[in-house]
Amino acid sequence: VPADKRIIVGITGASGVIYGVRCLQMLREIEGVETHAVISPAAFLTAQTEIDMTSQELRALPDVLHSFRDIGASIASGSFRTEGMLVAPCSVKTLSGIANCYADQLLVRAADVCLKERRRLVLMLRETPLHAGHIALMSTVTQAGAIIMPPVPAFYSRPASLDEMVSHTVGRALDLFDIDTGAVKRWKDAQAD
């Protein structure tokens, strides 16, 4: 049975690898969603450092894992239909590659395809503080059609744990693809508590 939706998840080596991991975990629980992932070599190191996840465990999360260097992969072509791509976390290096159309590896190429095909591209940029160069890159990709969504937690939901905070933030990112994970405590619901 073909999936109703395909979504690409890119995971870079920036701090915050849990966002990409949680995204793949959440999407695995939703029927009809097929995940395609491209993971940078640095992301495997970050996963080991930040969340004690082995490369084997990380590789097992998506439905389809594409090689970081495979520019000929299905997701490198506009004819391969997807809902779009979430890059979580997104490093400044990756942001720069996307902003400058410098697609020397699959993660940036897949993002570039989303932009040229006018598909959703959400970048969870993990950098702070920002200088003018970072802001210029964010402006460039936004003008090209991307959405910059830094993983800023919502406190109105009164998260009881870091896990809840991460799930809520990833749920908000997936809202942008019209995928409801059930993890987002909506504003009016939070006010009722």
Predicted regions and their residues:
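A cross-family phosphate/adenosyl-ligand binding-site feature
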Residues: 1-122, 126-193
